[in-house]
Amino acid sequence: MNETPLLHCSRLSKRYQEGKLYTYVLRNVSFMLERGEMMAIVGSSGSGKSTLLHLLGGLDEPTGGEVIFEGQQLNKLSSAARAMVRNRRLGFIYQFHHLLPDFTALENVAMPLLIGGARPAQAQETAREMLAAVGLEKRGHHRPAELSGGERQRVAIARALVNHPALVLADEPTGNLDQRNADSIFELLGELNMRQGTAFLVVTHDLQLAKRLHRQLEMRDGALLGAAQ
């Protein structure tokens, strides 16, 4: 018997209404992501990539279709249940790191654990281990303003992975970095995938970086067109 996919989205659509006018952002998007798989969705700005990630992460609800993650239909869960899934089983990385400026790197990484009810001492220890995993074991006491752009994004990655999620959703995670740091971040994601078995779904406009992942799909005008070329 085949193992159930980690993520299955079926005929996913999203539209917005202004008066009598409907604007479709996503149209009948369907695909599956296996456990431990790294997949890229490639497309230009405005193609619907970020909207898709919001639906997959339970941050928004689709107009039509369904998102099934670890056997649960996310868009049928209550807001509280979706929030619990996001905290415990999903990680998020964005183009801008969204670190809390008044907290150290260590405190930023520990935050999801504390929100989930972990004891402070255990949260700090786990966060320290995660910072070491991304090569920042000596930078934990620094605040975001004292870190380079690449270091801030590594802290954001550590925060996304600190709860050992099954899946990390990454929205243009290297879009704000120079080429050297972008290469380094994609290399790090690959290492974490191999070491921890975490699945990654990365949206990006950079096909060359996307080709480092296991699979690439192209999105255009809100529709998936198949393998990116």
Swiss-Prot record:
GO CC annotations, alphabetized: plasma membrane
Keyword set, alphabetical order: ATP-binding, Cell inner membrane, Cell membrane, Membrane, Nucleotide-binding, Translocase, Transport
Topology of the protein relative to the lipid bilayer: Peripheral membrane protein
GO BP annotation list: lipoprotein localization to outer membrane; protein localization to outer membrane
UniProt: ATP binding residues: 43-50
Entry's Gene Ontology molecular function annotations: ATP binding; ATP hydrolysis activity; transmembrane transporter activity
Keyword Ribosomal protein: no
This protein's record includes keyword RNA-binding: no
Primary localization: membrane
EC number: 7.6.2.-
Domain ABC transporter: 7-228
Pfam families on file: ABC_tran (PF00005)
Cell compartment(s), UniProt: Cell inner membrane
InterPro entries: AAA+_ATPase, ABC_transporter-like_ATP-bd, ABC_transporter-like_CS, ABC_transpr_LolD-like, LolD_lipo_ATP-bd, MacB-like_ATP-bd, P-loop_NTPase
UniProt similarity note: Belongs to the ABC transporter superfamily. Lipoprotein translocase (TC 3.A.1.125) family.
Role: Part of the ABC transporter complex LolCDE involved in the translocation of mature outer membrane-directed lipoproteins, from the inner membrane to the periplasmic chaperone, LolA. Responsible for the formation of the LolA-lipoprotein complex in an ATP-dependent manner.
Complex and partners: The complex is composed of two ATP-binding proteins (LolD) and two transmembrane proteins (LolC and LolE).
Name this polypeptide is given: Lipoprotein-releasing system ATP-binding protein LolD
Source species: Sodalis glossinidius (strain morsitans)
Gene: lolD
